[in-house]
């Protein structure tokens, strides 16, 4: 080990950072470290900060922060592993990847983790100490070898990996048990594999994740930022037994990849629980009975049900005996049953303390724009989307961001699910985001206008309006206000803005009329030259406050009724239509009832334009004569429709191309668009709904005796990738690329007969988009048989052509 010719060892250590780029850093917006050892510089770019960090000699620079508006750079000796992380405005944290890693690549020559015990458990001696062993490798001799404190290192390129001198006088040195990084091999089921293997086990080249050719799919990289879906590298984004990819062979949709298992043990798991927290992925109790009383099948057995959720495929998921577990990210722990007629079911696991199940389930924001009073500290609405459209992280979750704003630490702040809140008195409600690169953002909420208004709570929604009496109608913004050109010149706290050309009280060189000539930096008006997602801002005339945001209202849409935006907010409903929940009247205003000319309801449909309805082609099998049908819009009751509902006949029928189960109905006259009748939005051509997106089905269909018919019902269903849906145990290859699946695989209901032709509607950004037409399924609410829907995005050209030419 240390008996080689040390004279040449310096060749092994290139200057840290030489040739590096920002790709070697982890970036997190809105995060700041509490660091004692740091230096501050003036810097206008992140590249300048990086150069300062690489040149630092007084301490090892592990991270830096760049403050854009302050033109400031702070380089630091610590990172998020050794220092607490705080949320902060206008800062981007950059941390060197090498110092965040707790694993080794190859022989660990570049390992810079903090393990300080040997394989046998002996504490390491500090590299700078001379006792009990005089070291041959010391920080002074090898300054670039990372010989800090008593951390395990490999300064001599030992093939056996990192080691250290020990504190045992009888044992000079010993190797350390540093786990291998998952860039050359995989631990567990390869969920964290980040290597570059890009061929399947049969040798087929992988299809890039951001491509939809030759196979269209739902795993869109931008929708899964934490899954590292880069290039065409093998990955495991969905809880499979091992990494896989879509293939470049049109005849072979997907295949597993041959990733070798790491020889070292996997990193230690999180705390193992005897109760249910979140989705129960860390549950290790001994309950072995399902909710309906079926005894669980042993995980290592293939009778009565064959499966691949075995201990061999999921070695880190605790698949012991026949205990309920959640190896694949389902809603809660489950098991295969010993009943041949019931493949799998959820288990009844008691919750941990006061935590409720599914607290990590991401909820969508309401379409009706909620508002808040004051700073929003008493806001109790259900918005869960940030101002830039990112989904909020649940307050009880530590993924992807570790934090201390938990329900236990702030019991009076109503930190429920992932709803926007203001537990710390910021300027408005905010949340941590589901994007690993953006720690937090303010939420997509407006301040309530007017006086004497009451505080919004979870049961009340209000539509904010612009106070045109105090500000001209043009003094409002769209989106983040990058194009705002109004004359507001005070911050949210009422402080007067500093002129953009002024250098007092705050000096600045970046955001001036000369450097940003097209940003409208006139006078001291609020502007957003850097595209800040939190909106327009300005430097302030307060010497102690460099900058602050301005309170600019959102512009009211010129359209009275936008597609996909109901005037009544749909309720959050955890059930399905079978045994599901009743919809709020008129919360799905595009839903139509397709009836015979005698008034009998037999199918659903979706209004997509004032004179056009989309439904299923099989709903029109009883007659090719348009006069045989009529639609009713704006109703909630199936029988005895409300007086304000609209009954309109059908003038023409258009069935989809190539016998697709989709059809357009042209109405005798345009529907009157009002607060009870609003069209749904259409998706873009060939858009793919990401896997596990929560969508909604509505209808008056069969509830199998679980609730009375007559009122419109709704159900929430996750989209399932066709690759999964077509497995033998589910729909066995029946689902086409022009169709999509949605439902719960563990056997609770979805849409049923009577809902045919109705919508599968998904929330996107700030509106509901029609992604599917209810088409078929194997029975109703049968276990392992999700519903199948025509993929509307595949027929956008056909829809547009029919409507344009007729």
UniProtKB/Swiss-Prot annotation:
Signal peptide feature range: 1-19
PROSITE patterns, per the entry: KRINGLE_1, KRINGLE_2, PAN, TRYPSIN_DOM, TRYPSIN_HIS, TRYPSIN_SER
Entry-linked CDD domains: KR, PAN_AP_HGF, Tryp_SPc
Compartmental location: Secreted
GO function terms (MF aspect): serine-type endopeptidase activity; signaling receptor binding
Pfam family membership, one: Trypsin
Active site: 618, 661, 756
Disulphide bridges, residue numbers: 49-73, 53-61, 103-181, 124-164, 152-176, 185-262, 188-316, 206-245, 234-257, 275-352, 296-335, 324-347, 371-448, 392-431, 420-443, 476-555, 497-538, 526-550, 563-681, 573-581, 603-619, 695-762, 725-741, 752-780
Phosphoserine: residues carrying this PTM: 593, 684
EC number: 3.4.21.7
Assembly: Interacts with CSPG4 and AMOT. Interacts (via the Kringle domains) with HRG; the interaction tethers PLG to the cell surface and enhances its activation. Interacts (via Kringle 4 domain) with ADA; the interaction stimulates PLG activation when in complex with DPP4. Angiostatin: Interacts with ATP5F1A; the interaction inhibits most of the angiogenic effects of angiostatin.
Free-text comment about domains: Kringle domains mediate interaction with CSPG4.
Name this protein carries in UniProt: Plasminogen
Organism in which the protein naturally occurs: Notamacropus eugenii (Tammar wallaby)
């Amino acid at each position: 080990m240390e008996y080689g010719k040390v004279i040449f060892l310096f060749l092994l250590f290139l200057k840290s950072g030489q040739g590096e780029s920002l790709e070697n850093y982890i970036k997190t917006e809105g995060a700041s470290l509490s660091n004692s050892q740091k230096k501050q510089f003036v810097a206008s770019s992140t590249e300048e900060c990086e150069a300062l960090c690489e040149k630092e000699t007084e301490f090892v620079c592990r991270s830096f922060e760049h403050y854009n508006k302050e033109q400031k750079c702070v380089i630091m000796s610590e990172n998020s592993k050794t220092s607490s992380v705080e949320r902060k405005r206008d800062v981007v944290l950059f941390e060197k990847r090498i110092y965040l890693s707790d694993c080794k690549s190859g022989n660990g020559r570049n390992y810079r983790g903090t393990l300080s015990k040997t394989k046998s458990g002996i504490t390491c001696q500090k590299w700078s100490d001379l006792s009990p062993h005089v070291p041959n490798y010391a920080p002074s001799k090898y300054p670039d070898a990372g010989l800090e404190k008593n951390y395990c290192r490999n300064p001599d390129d030992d093939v056996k990996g990192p080691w250290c001198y020990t504190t045992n006088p009888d044992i000079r040195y010993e190797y350390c048990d540093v786990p291998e990084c998952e860039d050359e091999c995989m631990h567990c089921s390869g969920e964290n594999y980040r290597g570059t293997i890009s061929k399947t086990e049969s040798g087929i080249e992988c299809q890039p994740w951001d491509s939809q050719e030759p196979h269209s799919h739902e795993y869109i990289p931008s929708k899964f930022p934490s899954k590292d879906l880069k290039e065409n590298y093998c990955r495991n984004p969905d809880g499979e037994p091992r990494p896989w990819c879509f293939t470049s062979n049109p005849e072979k949709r997907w295949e597993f990849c041959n990733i070798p298992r790491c020889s070292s043990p996997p990193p230690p798991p999180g705390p193992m629980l005897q109760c249910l927290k979140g989705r129960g992925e860390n549950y290790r109790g001994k309950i072995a009975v399902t909710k309906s009383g079926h005894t669980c099948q042993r995980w290592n057995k293939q009778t009565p049900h064959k499966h691949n959720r075995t201990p061999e495929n999921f070695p880190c998921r605790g698949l012991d005996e026949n205990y309920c577990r959640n190896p694949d990210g389902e809603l809660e722990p489950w098991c295969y049953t010993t009943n041949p007629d019931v493949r799998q079911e959820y288990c009844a696991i008691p919750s941990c303390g006061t935590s409720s199940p599914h607290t990590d389930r991401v909820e969508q924001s309401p379409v009706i724009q909620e508002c808040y009073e004051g700073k929003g500290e008493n806001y109790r609405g259900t918005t869960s989307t940030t101002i830039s459209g990112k989904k909020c992280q649940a307050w009880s979750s530590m993924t992807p961001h570790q934090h201390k704003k938990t329900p236990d630490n702030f019991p009076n702040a109503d930190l429920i699910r992932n709803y926007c809140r203001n537990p710390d008195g910021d300027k408005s409600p905010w949340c941590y985001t589901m994007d690993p690169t953006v720690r937090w953002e303010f939420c997509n909420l407006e301040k309530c206008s007017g006086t004497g208004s009451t505080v919004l709570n979870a049961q009340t929604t209000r539509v904010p309006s612009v106070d045109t009496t105090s500000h001209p109608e043009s003094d409002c913004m769209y989106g983040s206000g990058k194009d705002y050109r109004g004359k507001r010149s005070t911050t949210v706290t009422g402080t007067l803005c500093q002129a953009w050309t002024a250098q007092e009280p705050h000096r600045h060189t970046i955001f001036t009329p000369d450097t940003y000539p097209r940003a409208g930096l006139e006078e001291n008006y609020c502007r957003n030259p850097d595209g800040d997602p939190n909106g327009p801002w300005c430097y302030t005339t307060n010497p102690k406050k460099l900058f602050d945001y301005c309170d600019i209202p959102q512009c009211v849409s010129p359209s009275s009724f936008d597609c996909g935006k109901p005037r009544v907010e749909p309720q959050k409903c955890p059930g399905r239509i079978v045994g599901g929940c009743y919809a709020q009247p008129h919360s799905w205003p595009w839903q139509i009832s397709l009836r015979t000319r005698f008034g009998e309801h037999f199918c659903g449909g979706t209004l997509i334009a004032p004179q056009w309805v989309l439904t299923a082609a099989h709903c029109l099998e009883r007659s090719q004569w348009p006069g045989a049908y009529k639609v009713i819009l704006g109703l909630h009751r199936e029988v005895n429709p409300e007086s304000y509902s609209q009954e309109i006949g059908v003038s023409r029928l258009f069935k989809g191309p190539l016998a697709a189960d989709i059809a357009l109905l042209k109405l005798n006259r345009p529907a009157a668009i009002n607060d009870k009748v609003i069209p749904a939005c259409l998706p873009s051509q060939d858009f793919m709904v990401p896997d596990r997106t929560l969508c909604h089905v509505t209808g008056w269909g069969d509830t199998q005796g679980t609730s009375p018919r007559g009122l419109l019902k709704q159900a929430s269903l996750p989209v399932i990738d066709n690759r999964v849906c077509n497995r033998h145990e589910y729909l066995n290859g029946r689902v086409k690329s022009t169709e999509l699946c949605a439902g719960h695989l563990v056997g609770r209901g979805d849409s049923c007969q009577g809902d045919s032709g109705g919508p599968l509607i998904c929330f996107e950004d700030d509106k509901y988009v029609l992604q599917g037409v209810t088409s078929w399924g194997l029975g109703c609410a049968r276990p392992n048989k999700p519903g199948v829907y025509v993929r509307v995005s595949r027929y956008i050209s056909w829809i547009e052509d029919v409507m344009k030419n007729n």
